[in-house]
């Protein structure tokens, strides 16, 4: 963010509304390509003048408004070899530059929001693992859950209209509209339930998707706050609603005294808990499935009439949390009942007390993970380790370092698992696959090569957590072992490992 403010020197009150002139700045495209500001981003040429990039971008935008933007003159191909290599390359350049520009108002608004709310260590909230402590704290007290796929609208105009609430520059919005209509077919790839954006232009379309999600969640949050039963709200705006609850209570006492609590909960909405991940969302509530059905039709109506995205109510399943497992972000999460029997004795009388407590558990699903390892040629489909083909010039240390890095990354990501058995199996597969790879390279048997490496090789596959705990508790091995078996969540994980992403 400091880099943006240093380059653009934007005034937060006015100047960031006029984004169109920034399209003709050299450093915009340098930032988009993560290049230095002293290097050309269109093609490598020591004598290339920075002012030429502005001329090129102006020509590209002008031809976008023409009837056939893919026709180039001979002079353009001779003077600028950039035009002659790929006819669709300039659409990628403009989209990347435009993505950097439209992110500026959102970035400034995010920074000002964090400063205003005084959120300490806000970078921890970006971690994938930050979701799971929230689930541990909340989900053990809930009863019903729905795992919902968030639909994405197909019509291009809705994407532009959504941005109108955030970007006030009409010229930029007109350019975006022309760009999307001209190159929509070449920039997206239809797949299954959602439109996946091509790898050539991920930044712009990720921005459009996130702006769509931001609009949807802002409306959803408003509905959620309005329908909650005001446990933590004391605002004068809701006095009428509170008075309505008082009348309900009086009505229930007079006519339905026996079922007073049930009648009152029928009118009052419990607090809705919401989690979003990878284009999906989790909704969870306490008490009755009737309220989950009501929220289901809220969402279907919102998607169909506000975002014009067709969605069938039958695709939203309502499940009991104690009988359902959530598979997301490489974990299988569920709420289990743990019963504990306590024997109590008072004088001569003794009796047993059976306590049932709900506990949120996260485990590593071994079958999908073995499938990912099989696709990467670490094992076969049954989970038996195999040798991985390597380059002839790869040294033994390079091969070992690669396997160690994969093993430690997986262990680091799955450190929050409440059961480590699946993780031990994955480490065994990677360790034996490494030995088989080295034995294949040196044309020896696995047994002979393993004797040559010795026990020190096996110790290298210890994860960072095991090494640190062994240093803290060098004498009490059982203590460090017990601590390692517990759940550890890290707030520095911002991306999913390719082997963990089963989507």
Curated annotation (Swiss-Prot):
<dbReference type="Pfam" id="PF01348">
    <property type="entry name" value="Intron_maturas2"/>
</dbReference>
<dbReference type="InterPro" id="IPR024942">
    <property type="entry name" value="Maturase_MatK_N"/>
</dbReference>
<dbReference type="InterPro" id="IPR024937">
    <property type="entry name" value="Domain_X"/>
</dbReference>
<dbReference type="Pfam" id="PF01824">
    <property type="entry name" value="MatK_N"/>
</dbReference>
<dbReference type="GO" id="GO:0008380">
    <property type="term" value="P:RNA splicing"/>
</dbReference>
<comment type="function">
    <text>Usually encoded in the trnK tRNA gene intron. Probably assists in splicing its own and other chloroplast group II introns.</text>
</comment>
<dbReference type="GO" id="GO:0009507">
    <property type="term" value="C:chloroplast"/>
</dbReference>
<dbReference type="GO" id="GO:0008033">
    <property type="term" value="P:tRNA processing"/>
</dbReference>
<dbReference type="GO" id="GO:0006397">
    <property type="term" value="P:mRNA processing"/>
</dbReference>
<comment type="similarity">
    <text>Belongs to the intron maturase 2 family. MatK subfamily.</text>
</comment>
<keyword id="KW-0507">mRNA processing</keyword>
<keyword id="KW-0150">Chloroplast</keyword>
<keyword id="KW-0934">Plastid</keyword>
<dbReference type="GO" id="GO:0003723">
    <property type="term" value="F:RNA binding"/>
</dbReference>
<protein>
    <recommendedName>
        <fullName>Maturase K</fullName>
    </recommendedName>
</protein>
<dbReference type="InterPro" id="IPR002866">
    <property type="entry name" value="Maturase_MatK"/>
</dbReference>
<keyword id="KW-0694">RNA-binding</keyword>
<keyword id="KW-0819">tRNA processing</keyword>
